[in-house]
């Protein structure tokens, strides 16, 4: 096969490749078998017309496009292998020459994986973070657990304060007319939670059960409902009841309520301390990893093709849809609730996608610079881990992974991250 690669501006180039006559003939034969099944030719049963009769009636050229469709995936794959390029998008293939009895000549405008110019990635300075759990952190966790056990009790003849929960009716009016979605009865609202638009909860502070009030507010300019954004409104409210939190004492009894496996507060503290210590060490390690990767990426130069960003954004959108589905929602319902559009969400995803693409490209370049190749032992160990995680046999995991290219790529990137971490300097 004759192949020619001409690099053009940026990450785009022109790939010229040929399909020799022997291969063309194979494609035409396969195309005829496919097409013949659908043909009705007088004098022959359906699907039984001979090749010679077909050529006489329709001409061999009638098979060219079907033959090309059959051959193109194989010959294009061989062409990019021979050219030594790594496409990142599906190309537009053009026919330069497709004559009967001659070699077919094709061209494709191909966007390829960009080259990465690495900067400094070893010996990078990172922040030294404290890994030891502090008394304050333990006390804060205990206080949260204590407050979760709090009970709401009715507040008699006392004004509402931040942190209280009020039961109220409300109805919103714009220009004296009630607007859609602005009404509720016996609604439970924790003051200070920020569930309502700015100012609403603050103006309930100081009211008592049985009080009625008109609350004048202006909707935020960025509010999702266009007819209300930036508009002045009045909410008529009536408070039915005010409840306040009654927090139990932090003692052995509360400890047993929080965790049935402990008998005393000291046992609970010890158990929580261990969990928090492990979580803090993991969090510090993660923060260090993110910082050192970010610095290596910042030091590198790479011109990222938009196609890579777009594909990654599509990938993120699919994950987003799956997360919504797990919550019993659909993207359509989410957009309806938030007032956002799919296009706006995709544009937002592209910002994250560009960062992810650059990070992966830089880590792959580091792996290449360090001559990192996963060993068979490392591959087998990872397969064992996956088999245990998903409850599968190792052979089934191997079959699902196919040529192992994705697994090998993941392992190489992990090793590249280890290179960054092992050489990082904490200051």
From Swiss-Prot:
Pfam families: FKBP_C, Trigger_C, Trigger_N. It is an enzyme of class 5 (isomerase). One of its GO terms (molecular function) is protein folding chaperone. Keywords: Cell cycle, Cell division, Chaperone, Cytoplasm, Isomerase, Rotamase. Residues 163-248 form the PPIase FKBP-type domain. GO terms for cellular component: cytoplasm. It is found in: Cytoplasm. Coiled coil: none annotated. Its EC number is 5.2.1.8. GO terms for biological process: 'de novo' cotranslational protein folding; cell division; chaperone-mediated protein folding; protein transport; protein unfolding. It catalyses: [protein]-peptidylproline (omega=180) = [protein]-peptidylproline (omega=0). Transmembrane segments: none annotated. PANTHER family: TRIGGER FACTOR CHAPERONE AND PEPTIDYL-PROLYL CIS/TRANS ISOMERASE (PTHR30560), TRIGGER FACTOR-LIKE PROTEIN TIG, CHLOROPLASTIC (PTHR30560:SF3). Involved in protein export. Acts as a chaperone by maintaining the newly synthesized protein in an open conformation. Functions as a peptidyl-prolyl cis-trans isomerase. Consists of 3 domains; the N-terminus binds the ribosome, the middle domain has PPIase activity, while the C-terminus has intrinsic chaperone activity on its own. Belongs to the FKBP-type PPIase family. Tig subfamily. This is Trigger factor. The lineage of its organism: Bacteria, Bacillati, Bacillota, Bacilli, Bacillales.
């Amino acid at each position: 096969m004759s192949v020619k690669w001409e690099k053009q501006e940026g990450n785009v180039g022109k790939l010229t490749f040929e399909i020799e006559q022997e291969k063309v003939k194979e494609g035409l034969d396969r195309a005829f078998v496919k097409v013949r099944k659908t043909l009705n030719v007088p004098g022959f049963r359906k699907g039984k017309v001979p090749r010679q009769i077909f050529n006489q009636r329709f001409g061999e050229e009638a098979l060219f496009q079907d033959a090309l469709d059959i051959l193109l995936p194989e010959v294009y794959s061989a062409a990019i292998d021979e050219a030594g390029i790594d496409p990142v998008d599906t190309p537009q293939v053009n026919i330069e020459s497709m004559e009967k009895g001659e070699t077919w000549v094709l061209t494709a405008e191909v966007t390829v994986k960009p080259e990465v110019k690495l900067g400094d990635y070893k010996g990078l300075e990172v922040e030294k973070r404290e890994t030891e759990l502090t008394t304050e952190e333990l006390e804060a966790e205990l206080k949260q657990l204590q407050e979760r056990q709090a009970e709401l009790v009715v507040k008699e003849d006392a004004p509402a304060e931040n942190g209280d929960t009020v039961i109220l009716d409300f109805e919103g009016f714009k220009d004296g007319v009630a607007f859609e979605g602005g009404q509720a009865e016996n609604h439970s609202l924790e003051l200070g939670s920020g569930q309502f638009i700015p100012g609403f909860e603050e103006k309930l502070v100081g009211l008592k059960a049985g009080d009625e009030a008109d609350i004048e507010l202006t909707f935020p300019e960025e509010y999702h409902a266009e007819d209300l954004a930036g508009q002045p409104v009045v909410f008529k409210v009536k408070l039915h009841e005010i409840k306040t939190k009654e927090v139990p004492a932090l003692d052995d009894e509360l400890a047993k309520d929080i965790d049935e496996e402990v008998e005393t507060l000291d046992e609970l503290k010890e158990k929580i301390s261990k969990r928090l210590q492990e979580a803090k060490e993991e969090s510090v390690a993660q923060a260090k990893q993110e910082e050192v990767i970010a610095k290596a990426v910042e030091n590198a130069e790479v011109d990222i093709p938009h196609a890579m960003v777009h594909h990654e954004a599509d990938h993120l959108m699919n994950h987003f849809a799956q997360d919504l589905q797990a919550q019993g929602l659909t993207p359509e319902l989410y957009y309806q609730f938030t007032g956002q559009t799919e296009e706006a969400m995709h544009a937002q995803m592209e910002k994250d996608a560009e960062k992810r693409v650059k990070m992966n490209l830089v880590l792959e370049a580091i792996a290449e610079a360090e001559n990192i190749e996963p060993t068979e032992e490392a591959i087998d160990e990872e397969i064992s881990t996956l088999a245990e995680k998903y409850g599968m046999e190792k052979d089934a995991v191997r079959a699902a992974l196919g040529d192992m290219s994705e697994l090998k790529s993941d392992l190489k990137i992990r090793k590249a991250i280890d290179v960054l971490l092992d050489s990082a300097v904490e200051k």
